[in-house]
Amino acid sequence: SITILLASLQLSAHKPVLRFNQEGRFKIAQFTDMHISVDKSDYCNEQAEKTFARLSRVANQEKPDFIVFTGDIVTRGDTRKGWQRLLDSLSTYKIPFCVTFGNHDPESGLSREEMSRIITSSPYSVNSLNSAGQLADMDLDVLSYSGDKPSMALYCLDSGDYSPDKSIGKYAWFSMDQILWLRNSCLKKTQENDGNVLNSLAFFH
């Protein structure tokens, strides 16, 4: 079974391996729109501490196998310090995680490339960089407990920030290249799974 917890708001040189446990369970905690702001004001610091406390409570009580952050994570204040504080917290939990950007993350004062380098510096991050040095769209296999065959697929996609065409809206959307990539990835996984569609979840802002 799969459990997803939604909250608004083996360490090696290799990426962590995602795997169902012996009971056939894989628990995911999802955090979104956290809008962490460090050292902007006393109020923002107070709210940030509440957010970190909530993250700690979920990590320690629910003990998820994987954490997904779906955008608008660290958006104001000393954003480099905010990201480092978040990564330090995740290192204490030793839980693999993935980040997708939201529309407000690029407003934080750090470029997408800078944020991407910070995120991928963590040994618990499953994110990788694309050719532009930004977080790549990810297709992640969750393996069965006893083998190396995927039992489920997770897709983490960047939905962009601002519209390239202001006449049709303020914020961006998935590109056709992303849609084709997702379609082809799903088809490939189906073929590799003896023609059976692999159970999948997609995460994005």
Give the predicted meaning of each segment:
Residues F20-N21, L201-H205:
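Short, solvent-exposed beta-strand-terminating loops
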Residues K15-V17, Q84-V197:
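Extended active-site neighborhood of metal-dependent phosphoesterases/phosphodiesterases
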Residues R25-V38, S151-P164, F203:
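Active-site-proximal beta-strand elements of phosphoester/diester hydrolases
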Residues S1-S8:
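Bacterial N-terminal signal peptides
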Residues H35-V38, A59-K63, L90-K94, C186-N193, ...:
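Sec/Tat-exported extracytoplasmic proteins
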Residues S8-L9, S163:
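Intrinsic structural disorder
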Residues Q30-T32, I67-D72, F97-N103, N196, ...:
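Active-site neighborhood of phospho(di)ester-bond hydrolases with catalytic His/Asp-centered motifs
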